[in-house]
Amino acid sequence: MLSLWRAIRRLGRAAEPAPAPPVPAGPAVAAELAGSVQVRHVDAGSCNGCELEIGAAFGPVYDAERYGARLVASPRHADALVVTGAVTRNMVEPLRRTYEAVGEPKVVVAVGDCARNCGVFAEAYGVVGAVADVVPVDLEVVGCPPRPETIVAALRLCTGR
Amino acid sequence: MSALGVAGGVLQAVVIVGGAPLLLGLMRQVRARLEGRAGPGVGQPWRDLRKLVRKQSISPRGTTEVFRVAPVLLVAMTLVVAVVAPLVTTASAVPPVADLFVVVALLAHATVVIALAGLDSGTAFGGMGASREVTVLALVEPTALVAIFALSVPTGSTSLPTIVGTALDDPQRLISPASLLAAVALAAVIVAETGRLPVDNPSTHLELTMIHEAMVLEYAGPDLALVELGSAMRLSVYLGLFTSLFVPWGIATTATPLALALGVVALVVKVGVVGAGLAALEVFLAKLRLFRVPELLAGSFLLALLAVTTAYVLG
């Protein structure tokens, strides 16, 4: 316990200074959500590269929580669906049902090149298509995998903070 | 029903409802800072509630009225306790309800209602969460009753305002062995009942490790707002009761505006300090394995039992 306390004292604040708030050009629902976005992450067939970066975005350094975004365990609690990976056959129905379980108003963020256009997995036998082929997508995050800063920037467009 | 009691009841309801989300925000902020994060700010739970109220209300297929009335009952029962318990003043708005057994039963009832709603949702995690919550509840309620009963022994009354009033008149009683043992037992009860570490992790995303969160996974929109507000109020009420019983100084004994203002400030400061301390302590704790939780709770029951024994033996 003492060593943990010493580590806390030594590290201090790990969060990087917050970049300037986004110009209000996000999706229209950002105004309704007013600074609070609960995020449900759906892995539709990702290689887990994007998951690592999402984990980093909510970690101490990038700290997406300070802008009002929070990961939750249930789509019923969520306002935003963060979908990663090309949609595989087995995940089409779960993704659609998760989308239906989220109450209005809702946002869908496609994170990573696979979610946007299937990336290197395009036309693979197990892949149905990009996320936009299954559910309507409001925001896209470019990168393979995307940098945590860009994921945080997309989430800030949703929270408006 | 005295003027002091009514004024206290109104103030307590306002302070608990308005302050409970802020307490939750404060605890999350303390935790964030200790983890090296910047944190979303103390007002974030209120922002979450404001957004949830505006969201679409969903009642999942197959759920019944139990699922729909549970959030209202949770908030209502906690609000009754917030009104009658001696938090701001030593008098109660409804003295017969401010009894130790009634207050503990009301708080337990709120848990049972949410557990029933968890069962009603018919999902695997709802039932699992309900079974876990009721297991914890069955082990915690005797401890809560016995621990507060130990404090009532020297007073000769189970009325909470009387217990707090006597403690104010005779502060030496607060550092008696019975009182200290009861304080430790009650602290374990509060940690278990409000779903904090090491019994339950309030910020987990893993359904399999959840206790409280697993029961409310199906709630959405305004219903979820009520459930979250109710949970936050439970935490504030428990911490408020704890500070009133063991650190009663500052509580209003007369109905003058100055005394009432001091009572409110004292309650906010005491609960804030205890809450921040609890949040800081949580950083150093890992969640207990579920099968180890009964051992912790049995230990706290033993302390409560010892408290009652010493209260009788040492007077």
Question: What are the language-model segments listed below?
Answer:
Chain B
Residues P21-V30, A108-G118, A183-N201, G272-L281:
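Transmembrane alpha-helical segments that form the membrane-embedded catalytic/substrate-channel core
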Residues S57-P60, L79-P95, I114-T123, V153-S159, ...:
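Transmembrane alpha-helix boundary signature
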Residues G8-L23, P95-A108, Q172-E193, L260-G263:
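Alpha-helical transmembrane segments
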Residues G277-L303:
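Interfacial loop-to-transmembrane junctions
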Residues P96, A150-A182:
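Juxtamembrane/interfacial segments at transmembrane-helix boundaries in multi-pass membrane proteins
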Residues M27-Q56:
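Membrane-interface amphipathic/juxtamembrane segments adjacent to transmembrane helices
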Residues D48-V66, A124-F125, V216-D223:
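Cytosolic juxtamembrane amphipathic/interface segments immediately preceding
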Residues V102-A117, A138-T155:
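Mid-bilayer segments of alpha-helical transmembrane spans in multi-pass integral membrane proteins
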